[in-house]
């Protein structure tokens, strides 16, 4: 059982993120094993992260050593990268993912971005010539085939606006179960949350702490004076206050830390709650999206502005 429960769609409420800079298989493998011991059951990866193989190794060892009874006790999520967001490349991409993971299926397979690149473009920097128009219908039909074949128990999307979800739902035979997007106290996603609830789509938060330390991240979440004051008054860390806030919205969340102490802290958000006054203070924090997808916007590409990429929703 997951230490933190599951959403109605079956997605564990708290997952371990594994997007790391550079090839680091040993730390990822060790961190996943320790996370399983601590109670994590959801592990979030992607073809673009290059961490699928160590997650698969850790999962196999966890089953072999009895940390979990079987593969079915774990929930593994991966994502198809933009270079494989083509009708004829989605299924082969998932088969490679499964080979990396040494698994017969993933629990959730998602479209990483509503973006298509030329085949083979996996590493930045990207040029305008690398981008092609995103054929949402073709890509989603390929995702549905992955589900029908039993290779993905569920399918979803990442970084989709309300407008893009509306378009997808207009033709999808199998609707997306999850939309994984940036959510934190500095980017609260009220409109998107309301839309997804109405449509039965589970939100899952990435960068719930603001992705401090990444090339695109920000200190604005962890350095928030409001969050520091609330944390001090409750005897919690700022990270715990952020994660608890996301948790109270009904969202699932992905949090990345390979430090054992912080991994434990990040699970300790379930048996306490924020007061109404604290929620109100957080609701008034000025809003600013941190991960704007800058590298996918180009005057010569399909998305010529942030307005086009996010449909005016940032």
From Swiss-Prot:
Superkingdom, taxonomy of origin: Eukaryota
Catalysed reactions, as listed in the record: 2'-deoxymugineate + NAD(+) = 3''-deamino-3''-oxonicotianamine + NADH + H(+); 2'-deoxymugineate + NADP(+) = 3''-deamino-3''-oxonicotianamine + NADPH + H(+)
Residues that bind substrate: 112
MF annotations from Gene Ontology: 3''-deamino-3''-oxonicotianamine reductase activity; aldose reductase (NADPH) activity
UniProt: NADP(+) binding residues: 44, 158-159, 180, 258-266, 273-281
EC class: oxidoreductase
Active site: 49
A biological process term (GO) from this entry: cellular response to zinc ion starvation
EC number from the UniProt entry: 1.1.1.285
Record's note on what induces expression: Up-regulated under iron-deficient conditions in root tissues.
pH profile of the protein: Optimum pH is 8-9.
Recorded family membership: Belongs to the aldo/keto reductase family.
Protein name, per record: Deoxymugineic acid synthase 1
């Amino acid at each position: 059982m997951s230490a933190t429960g599951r959403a109605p769609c079956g997605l564990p409420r708290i997952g371990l993120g594994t997007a790391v800079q550079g090839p680091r298989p040993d730390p990822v493998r060790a961190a996943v094993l320790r996370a399983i011991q601590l109670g994590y059951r959801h592990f979030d990866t992607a073809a673009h992260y290059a961490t699928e193989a160590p997650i698969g190794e850790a999962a196999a060892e966890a089953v072999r050593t009895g940390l979990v009874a079987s593969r079915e006790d774990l929930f593994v999520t991966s994502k198809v990268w933009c270079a494989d967001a083509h009708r004829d490349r989605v299924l082969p991409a998932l088969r490679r993912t499964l080979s990396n993971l040494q698994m017969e299926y993933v629990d959730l397979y998602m479209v990483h971005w509503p973006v298509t690149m030329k085949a083979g473009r996996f590493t930045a920097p990207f040029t305008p010539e690398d981008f092609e128009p995103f054929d949402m219908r073709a890509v989603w039909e390929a995702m549905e085939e992955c589900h029908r074949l039993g290779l993905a128990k569920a399918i979803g999307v990442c970084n989709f606006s309300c407008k893009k979800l509306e378009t997808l739902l207009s033709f999808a035979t199998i609707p997306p179960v999850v939309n994984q997007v940036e959510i934190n106290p500095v980017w609260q996603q009220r409109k998107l949350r309301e839309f997804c609830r109405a449509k039965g789509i589970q939100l899952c938060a990435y960068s719930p702490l603001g992705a401090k330390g990444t090339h695109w991240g920000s200190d604005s979440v962890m350095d928030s004076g409001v969050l520091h004051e609330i944390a001090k008054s409750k005897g919690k860390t700022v990270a715990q206050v952020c994660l608890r806030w996301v948790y109270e919205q009904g969202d699932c969340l992905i949090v990345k830390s390979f430090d054992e102490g912080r991994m434990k802290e990040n699970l300790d958000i379930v048996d306490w709650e924020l007061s109404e006054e604290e929620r109100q203070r957080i609701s008034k924090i000025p809003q600013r999206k941190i991960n704007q997808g800058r590298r996918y916007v180009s005057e010569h590409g399909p998305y010529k502005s942030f307005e086009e990429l996010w449909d005016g929703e940032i």
